[in-house]
């Protein structure tokens, strides 16, 4: 369950982002994302009931010690999870725009789920132009930094960074501050081959990263569609249907062993507790509830699934 403080959301100016994420979550339901099932609220909080994903974030599973980095086969499995989740949301007309290890959560079977749609956008190539700078430094694409038009391919740059980070244990574009990171994303050339690739990793993995980290959107792997990524030689042995139906035992790949090994790294991020200071913010809270800002934050997936084309809830009766 995700507990969201109304006051905190108001004070941080995140109401629009929360509404956007809520509306996007209602559109999505897929085996490899964090799905919304129910939402309700009380006077102070909004509660979102999402998939139970106890394995922690991918960030918490990236070890500091190079010898503990994932194997190539493990990385290919994890990346295939991410690719399928991106394929699904892109088919629903959604650009994620914040793909990073913190927004990928493990379930208890060792599969990754895409989460956090707070800055995602609904995209239509015919009439949508997205230029704003959003995302996390170190993972955003060059076109976002330069305020050039964004599209689904912008998500694939972040995918390339994650592959690089899982192999080398660090991001390809680093810096002392946001400006330096952005400068490196725009100008630092990344070219991997069998000579400078990490030991025991293939030249195909190097080629995969090189093509995802192309600076120009139209030259990036996936610019002709996500099937271009799925058919790359590095992923030629991936059984996409079996992964989508979770017929691959991640335990046999050693993924569950990694989750157990690093479970102490799974820090629970606690929301700032406004309950202890709520008196100070009573005026704000009264304003929020009086204006009914969050009036539409009620959702029931079962009812929504059973609606007809006119929005009326129907019941399934035995014939």
What is the predicted role of each segment?
Residues 39:
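Activation-segment/catalytic-loop signature of the eukaryotic protein kinase fold
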